[in-house]
Amino acid sequence: MEDFVRQCFNPMIVELAEKTMKEYGENPKIETNKFAAICTHMEVCFMYSDFHFINERGESIIIEPGDSNALLKHRFEIIEGRDRNMAWTVVNSICNTTGVGKPRFLPDLYDYKEDRFIKIGVTRREVHIYYLEKANKIKSEETHIHIFSFTGEEMATKADYTLDEESRARIKTRLFTIRQEMASRGLWDSFRQSERGEETIEERFEIKGTMRRLADQSLPPNFSSFDNFRAYVDGFEPNGYIEGKLSQMSREVNARIEPFLKTTPRPLRLPCGPPCFQRSKFLLMDALKLSIEDPSHEGEGIPLYDAVRCMKTFFGWKEPIIVKPHEKGINSNYLLAWKQVLAEIQDFEDEKKIPRVKNMKKTSPLKWALGENMAPEKVDFEDCKDVSDLKQYDGDEPEFRSLASWIQNEFNKACELTDSSWLEIDEIGEDIAPLEHIASMRRNYFTAEVSHCRATEYIMKGVYINTALLNASCAAMDDFQLIPMISKCRTKEGRRKTNLYGFIIKGRSHLRNDTDVVNFVSMEFSLTDPRLELHKWEKYSILEIGDMVLRTAIGQVARPMFLYVRTNGTSKIKMKWGMEMRRCLLQSLQQIESMIEAESSVKEKDMTKEFFENKSETWPIGESPKGVEEGSIGKVCRTLLAKSVFNCLYASPQLEGFSAESRKLLLIVQALRDNLEPGTFDLGGLYESIEECLINDPWVLLNASWFNSFLTHALR
């Protein structure tokens, strides 16, 4: 093949092709088919340009060799064949003088008559497949594409072939001659089969060896090689393909692609019914902490010791009374369970006698609250398979609930700043590479914005509770263990602080599978009067257990202290994820980082410092009925963190389904906003799949409400 190339092509073209291949680290003596392809491509580019000039009236004319053309301007600027730096210099110069947009990839020619760059393609395959590959790669309407094949076919953008028929015929004849010459030497088959998509001199990542074999083995049916599959994917036109498939289907399938217009989407239908209720595993904005500053007592750090010290800071205990009963529960049992906790803690008269772990006596109220002996008896299937009316339990249909205002209030509160710092980030060594320095800077800025955020408190509280509960579930399977709900933070002055939110009593926990459930009773302190929002506390039995004296602007005020009690349950897999709630920090930091990267790529330098320190700039935070809400970069950080934390606290199948399905509609709306003229079919089916997830979950209902606000404002 190398000998053929040197005989068949002009020595100048051969020399340029050799230089080009060496520039990209390729050897013409080894990659002979590529050598031939580059020479062919260059010759076509030169033939395209030959004899074409522009006269003084700006008209394109053809002047044969030998005729005078000294005063005429060449119609085409040849870019192909120049070294890469020079080629880009020529392109930039043309863009500056003509105002034409700069192409993403090096073109082959510039047409001064039509004022456009041209990409020439020469293919040994079908022209339309190669044309689509080029178009998909270039993704620009400003660069004109013209493809020739060795069989005499051609294809060009909008069927505009630029040259007269005679000039194009000359190129096709030359290609046909090259093909015949190769065939007569037995070189054509090898040359034809060697084409792998792009054969021009652009860089290409080549897969070789084991990876190549794996790629060829890992293909859908009907594809013989990875290259065929890639060519198919590159040339894939989704809308046309879908319409084609629909036309082949049964006549019963009645699906037409409809244009998606501003007037097309409707709001999501939120369910009606009683207001939704609080279902998180622990109280959020309504939680009350009993705290000790600078703890230095004996056994400091042992949860039970810390809890006893925190309990001793409060002197307003009183005889508990039920102020809000649970409709279906035996509320007196919850009352007796709290009395039992108080009594067993008060038994530790001398602090030196406090045990490291406290197992509660298995009293009747606790057994009831923890569902002891309530599970139906398991019978071996072999013993009952002949029972004629054997059937599965009828599951109750979930009751539809409407959106309540408390969940928006919870979210707003989670975005707020507290007066304590909840994050202790470990030192991770000195930065060495510049990238590490940027990463540390971003982490430090982000940490400063979110360390005092209430959502961060929820993370640390969730990590502690889930870790303690999982440890107890594995270490004391048969015991009703008392687990204090504790968190640790630092005050504004930097003093350490230990907080007690309440207690958990764990039930029997023989957890074999990840989804096996352990029951627990949570008892949490609060100053929130439940009678203000009774619907929020449907699952709770609430006691008044004391009076707390608070300092206010008008002096000291006594407020009733409540205990929110409920039976709840969790599983190993839920506790495992709860222990990893710190991931929420990482997720929201990555979202912020993508915003910084977008800004940095526009400014062509790292914008981290400017991003966080420009306090005057506001950023979109989310949608509300009023429109797009904006705030400082700190508010954006805290809002993104709160969303991530709530996704964790309110994780459910409803949230999974809503997120996956609503994303599809969101992408369609975004495509419409980007003027991409999206088309849809069975939009009603998509709405159905979104709305079947809107049942009773407060966080999902709030997200659906936000989605409706987005639809309203996005399509104005």
Swiss-Prot record:
Presence of the UniProt keyword Iron in the record: no
GO BP terms: cap snatching; DNA-templated transcription; symbiont-mediated suppression of host gene expression; symbiont-mediated suppression of host mRNA transcription via inhibition of RNA polymerase II activity; viral RNA genome replication; viral translational frameshifting
InterPro entries: INFV_PA, PA/PA-X, PA/PA-X_sf
Known cofactor(s): Mn(2+)
EC numbers, comma separated: 3.1.-.-
UniProt: Mn(2+) 1 binding residues: H41, D108, I120
UniProt entry keywords in alphabetical sequence: Cap snatching, Endonuclease, Eukaryotic host gene expression shutoff by virus, Eukaryotic host transcription shutoff by virus, Host cytoplasm, Host gene expression shutoff by virus, Host nucleus, Host-virus interaction, Hydrolase, Inhibition of host RNA polymerase II by virus, Manganese, Metal-binding, Nuclease, Phosphoprotein
GO (cellular component) term, any one: host cell nucleus
Highest taxon in the source lineage: Viruses
Residue positions binding Mn(2+) 2: E80, D108
Localization per record: Host cytoplasm; Host nucleus
Cofactor binding note of this UniProt entry: Binds 2 manganese ions per subunit.
Pfam families with a match to the protein in the record: Flu_PA (PF00603)
Motif placement: Nuclear localization signal 1 (NLS1): 124-139
Motif (Nuclear localization signal 2 (NLS2)): 184-247
Summary of subunit composition and partner proteins: Influenza RNA polymerase is composed of three subunits: PB1, PB2 and PA. Interacts (via C-terminus) with PB1 (via N-terminus).
Function, in words: Plays an essential role in viral RNA transcription and replication by forming the heterotrimeric polymerase complex together with PB1 and PB2 subunits. The complex transcribes viral mRNAs by using a unique mechanism called cap-snatching. It consists in the hijacking and cleavage of host capped pre-mRNAs. These short capped RNAs are then used as primers for viral mRNAs. The PB2 subunit is responsible for the binding of the 5' cap of cellular pre-mRNAs which are subsequently cleaved after 10-13 nucleotides by the PA subunit that carries the endonuclease activity.
Entry protein name: Polymerase acidic protein
